[in-house]
């Protein structure tokens, strides 16, 4: 069963591409026709590609790995922040910091700096600074929160990158490709899909179109997270059951020893009887 359908995408305007003169020929396989100088995306292919991408993202989430979402364009920022925060995945909706992937250790240091400032505030160290120093530190903390707050829990490189606008987020895509991180993306008719591993042909400018695609993607990731949770619970129950059986096995050992001893005693008694009978015959 598809995660979304043709009509839902149609109502969201996901089929509207860019002007014909702005098109990228490499998107030709995903274009249905041209109408009034605008390319129309083949939504049947969008449904297929969206399902393919969603299933792959589900498996990534199920394995316990993270997907980093990138959408800094105005139409997508609020939608991405709301929907992705709800499923607990990291996201970037402000400026993409150069080296966020290729220079990840430095980014982690900046995130840790933010945590250090919080710790100073909580333990009272912050009170020892002058008013001017407090103001500078507060501004620094606010800037870090704005740019890196949404990836604070990303302790290692993500397993995949999801991009809403390939052209606008070209730097993020380049960094991901350098590190062999698979890229999932909404790709409009004016974009080059060459570096995208999972192409989702769709209008990346309309808010409704972006929301529909993200709903399907977030739904798949949520499924993966839920299945992982259930598997862990099942594993924990099996471990508890196994631990519960362990004492029973220990208790069984004395009974086995007693049974063996009784068997040996019986054999010895039988031998004694045979010996006694033999001695009587000899007499």
Where are these regions (language model features)?
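Intrinsically disordered, compositionally biased charged tails
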Residues: 1-3, 226-283
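Ribosome large-subunit tunnel/peptidyl-transferase-proximal elements
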Residues: 1-233
């Amino acid at each position: 069963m598809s995660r979304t359908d043709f009509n839902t995408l149609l109502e969201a305007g996901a089929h509207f591409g860019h002007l014909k003169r702005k098109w990228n020929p490499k998107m030709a396989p995903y274009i249905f026709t041209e109408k009034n100088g605008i390319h129309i995306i083949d939504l049947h292919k969008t449904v297929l590609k969206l399902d393919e991408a969603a299933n792959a993202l589900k498996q990534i989430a199920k394995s316990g790995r993270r997907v980093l979402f990138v959408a800094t364009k105005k139409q997508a920022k609020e939608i991405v922040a709301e929907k992705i925060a709800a499923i607990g995945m990291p996201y970037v909706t402000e400026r993409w910091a150069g080296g966020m992937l290729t220079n990840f250790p430095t980014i982690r240091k900046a995130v840790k700096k933010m945590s250090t400032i919080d710790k100073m505030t909580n333990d009272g160290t912050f009170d020892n600074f002058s008013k001017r120093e407090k103001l500078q530190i507060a501004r620094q903390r606010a800037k870090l929160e704005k740019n890196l707050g949404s990836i604070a829990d990303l302790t290692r490189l993500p397993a995949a990158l999801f991009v809403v606008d390939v052209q606008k987020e070209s730097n993020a895509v380049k960094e991901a490709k350098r590190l062999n991180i698979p890229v999932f993306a909404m790709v409009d008719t004016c974009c080059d899909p060459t570096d995208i591993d999972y192409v989702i042909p769709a209008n990346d400018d309309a808010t409704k179109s972006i929301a529909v695609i993200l709903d399907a993607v977030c739904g798949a990731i949520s499924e993966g997270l839920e299945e992982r949770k259930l598997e862990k619970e099942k594993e924990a129950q099996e471990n508890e059951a196994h631990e519960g059986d362990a004492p029973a096995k220990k208790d069984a050992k004395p009974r086995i020893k007693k049974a063996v001893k009784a068997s040996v005693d019986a054999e010895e008694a039988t031998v004694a009887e045979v010996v006694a009978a033999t001695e009587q015959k000899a007499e």
